[in-house]
From Swiss-Prot:
The gene is tatE. Belongs to the TatA/E family. TatE subfamily. It comes from Dickeya chrysanthemi (strain Ech1591). One of its GO terms (cellular component) is TAT protein transport complex. Residues 45-69 are annotated as: Disordered. GO terms for biological process: protein transport by the Tat complex. The keyword Disulfide bond does not apply. It is found in: Cell inner membrane. Residues 54-69 have a biased composition (Basic and acidic residues). The chain crosses the membrane at residues 1-21. This is Probable Sec-independent protein translocase protein TatE. One of its GO terms (molecular function) is protein transmembrane transporter activity. The keyword Transmembrane helix applies.
Length: 69
């Protein structure tokens, strides 16, 4: 097993273009890019909210226990 050569990749790419067509591949690439961009935006928006909510929480008050008399 030699692995995948450049010639094999070109043949696979040509078959994909023949099966799906260039317009379908172009729209698929745009959709994939938009999905990745939306995912990154959601991750970046979520991180500051998590940090601020952790800072907003106040620790519970410390209670004192006294021995029974």
């Amino acid at each position: 097993m030699e692995g995948i050569s450049i010639a094999k990749l070109l043949v696979i790419g040509a078959l994909i273009v023949l099966l799906f067509g260039t317009n379908k591949l172009r729209s698929l690439g745009g959709d994939l890019g938009a999905a990745i961009k939306g995912f990154k935006k959601a991750m970046n928006d979520d991180q500051p909210a998590a940090k601020s909510s952790a800072q907003d929480e106040h620790p519970a008050a410390i209670s004192e226990t006294r021995p029974k008399e």
